[in-house]
A protein has these predicted regions:
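Glycine-rich FAD pyrophosphate-binding loop
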Residues: 5, 21-45
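Glycine-rich loop(s) and the adjacent beta-strand/alpha-helix scaffold that form part
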Residues: 165-211
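Residue-level recognition of phosphate/Mg2+-coordinating polar/acidic sites
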Residues: 22-23, 35, 56, 73, ...
């Protein structure tokens, strides 16, 4: 039986602790807050969109050739659904999004808490790990003592405890008010790991385009495309939301994964909005040709609504666009300069983190044997729609099982 410490009481940490304890180990879960799962309660607007039936390798930043994808092929959406059902939580699917049947995040919190209680996991709250050191022979009071454990964990209150294995599942930097301050990155660096620069993603994109003030509060189905220094990055379709000096909506959140870093590097970033993605430019041109003279304004208002119509017509006038080809181009290629993104205070996820090339398919460090990682502390980010939470659950389970069995 090994003595295993899991640092971080979120979904990844809970699954890691449960899995490791299921293998017959003594497991201690360390959580800096007064209780675990604070951030979990916010997911899916409080409904906990825990997974997505449309899991694909391109939904994440690592792609299909990375060993992590093989893990997700095994521990897929169906696996997680069955896992929860076996533990007593029914689920349901809306489109491809998966939720607990109760549509309440606290249902998942209660389930995870009961799972940890069942496996007698020792949950220690209000405890922050500030240092982890791998002990080698001669470093334990002058003599190596296997019974003392291979890792020394120092805490903010001055206490130091020894463990055989460590699983770091501290999350990233998103929602720092809930304890996500990047502490896990410091611990990883201390143990020899590279940590890439971090950026807030799945967040709003900011703009200083004053013309957009007229459409604040408007929502419109559209296709949005990111452009960085003249090169197209990615496209998404969905509901585009115009906020005060910002663009929002799931389609924008997904694009922020590709734009946050270039924004920080002062690249020229543009969002190109296609207000009629269901029609090609040629089809739209032909349609516009059939509209009688003097009726174009009516077409815009009926099709796009009063505020959006006014925005488009102003753009057409400002750029002196008069023929149907030019008008069609504006509708299909409305360009918005992006000047920034929201901070980690508003972002859902962190881009960047512990270098995943230094972690194997069992989520064990290639640098420090006995050290494992799970969840958002790793340089893994996925799309909106349950992808990131699924990775937290799956990576936590895999890390816990790997740590628990390798004794």
């Amino acid at each position: 039986m090994a003595n295993i410490c899991v640092v971080g009481g979120g979904p990844a940490g809970a699954m890691a602790a449960y899995a490791a304890a299921s293998c017959g180990n003594k497991v201690t879960l360390i959580e800096r807050n007064e209780e675990p799962f604070k951030k979990l309660l916010l997911t899916g607007s409080g409904k906990c969109n825990y997974s997505n039936s449309d899991l694909k390798s391109d939904s994440y930043n690592f792609g299909q050739n990375h060993p992590f994808w093989k893990v997700l092929e095994e521990l897929n959406s169906d696996w997680l659904e069955e896992f929860f059902k076996e533990k007593g939580m029914l689920t349901y699917k809306k489109d491809s999004l998966k939720y607990p049947r109760s549509e309440r995040s606290d249902t998942v919190k209660k389930l995870l808490s009961s799972m940890l209680l069942e496996k007698k996991v020792d949950i220690v709250t209000r405890k922050k790990a500030v240092s982890i050191k791998k002990k080698s022979e001669g470093e334990t009071n002058g003599e190596y003592n296997k019974e003392a454990g291979c890792f020394a964990v120092a805490f903010e209150d001055g206490e130091e405890l020894n463990f055989d294995k460590i699983i770091i599942a501290t999350g990233g930097k998103a929602y720092p008010s809930l304890g996500s301050d990047g502490a896990g990155y410091r611990l990883a660096r201390e143990l020899g790991h590279k940590v890439s620069f971090t950026y807030p993603v799945l967040t709003r994109l900011l703009t200083d385009d004053k013309d957009l003030n007229a459409v604040t509060g408007v929502r419109f189905k559209a296709k949005v495309t990111g452009e960085v220094d003249g090169k197209i990055t990615e496209s998404e379709e969905g509901e585009l939301q115009f906020n005060d000096n910002a663009l929002s909506g799931i389609c924008i959140f997904n694009l922020s994964r590709f734009l946050s870093k270039p924004i920080e590097e002062n690249a020229k970033c543009i969002i190109i909005v296609d207000f009629l993605p269901e029609m090609s430019e040629e089809e739209l041109e032909e349609y516009l040709k059939k509209i009688p003279d003097g009726e174009i304004g009516r077409f815009f208002e009926i099709t796009f609504g009063e505020k959006t119509a006014a925005l488009l017509l102003k753009k057409i006038k400002d750029e002196n666009r008069k023929n149907v080809k030019d008008i069609s181009y504006i509708i299909k290629n409305f360009r918005i300069k992006i000047t920034g993104h929201d901070s980690f205070n508003q972002a859902q996820v962190t881009k960047g983190g512990v270098d995943i090339d230094e972690v194997d398919e069992n989520f064990e460090s290639k640098i420090c044997k006995g050290l494992f990682f799970a969840g958002e502390v790793l340089d893994v980010d996925g799309k909106c729609g349950g992808y990131n939470l699924h990775f937290a659950f799956a990576s936590g389970y895999k890390a816990g099982m790997s740590a628990g069995k390798e004794i």
